[in-house]
Amino acid sequence: MSLATLDTTQHPNLPASSATLFSAKATKALSFEQIAQHIGRNEVATAAIFYGQAKASPEDIEKLSSLLDIDHETLKAQLSGFPDRGRSVEMPPKEPLIYRLYEIVQNYGYAYKAVLNEKFGDGIMSAISFSTKVEKETDEQGNNWAVITLRGKWLPFSRF
């Protein structure tokens, strides 16, 4: 199994906690799925903690510290603040997989908007009251497909 690692030279805007967490993840040879199961979170949410894009709860910090053998006080100091979301990726992104996600929004963004507006009215899909998951699907020919589910609360615009 290949594991996601971190090259800090490619991600200079990530918080110190990212290097700490990824180093311990590599040492323990754990996948995000395994770590997520241990802390009781979704694997994408777990990866978001590692990239400094999601807030870790005190319970998350305790469980990560224990699982990854990271000093609790060090991890608590690094993860107890509020995330500075959105700084980790330059726009447009250069990493090919992240660029494909960006490209999906470029190509289908207005189509999604039109369909969502027709179904829900004038509003937006929350990225705060939100969940996501990634699944692997294999078709009859043996081709692997990535299935990404985005689930956000619908927030109608207020009339004032």
Swiss-Prot record:
Keywords for the protein's UniProt record, in alphabetical order: Lyase
Xref: Gene3D superfamilies: Cyanate lyase, C-terminal domain, lambda repressor-like DNA-binding domains
Active site positions: R100, E103, S126
Signal peptide: none
SMART domains assigned: Cyanate_lyase
Entry GO MF terms: cyanate hydratase activity; DNA binding
Record's catalysed reaction(s): cyanate + hydrogencarbonate + 3 H(+) = NH4(+) + 2 CO2
EC main group: lyase
InterPro entries: Cyanase, Cyanate_lyase_C, Cyanate_lyase_C_sf, Lambda_DNA-bd_dom_sf
Swiss-Prot/TrEMBL GO biological process terms: cyanate metabolic process
Enzyme Commission number(s): 4.2.1.104
Family indicated by similarity: Belongs to the cyanase family.
Function: Catalyzes the reaction of cyanate with bicarbonate to produce ammonia and carbon dioxide.
Protein name: Cyanate hydratase
Source organism per UniProt: Emericella nidulans (strain FGSC A4 / ATCC 38163 / CBS 112.46 / NRRL 194 / M139)
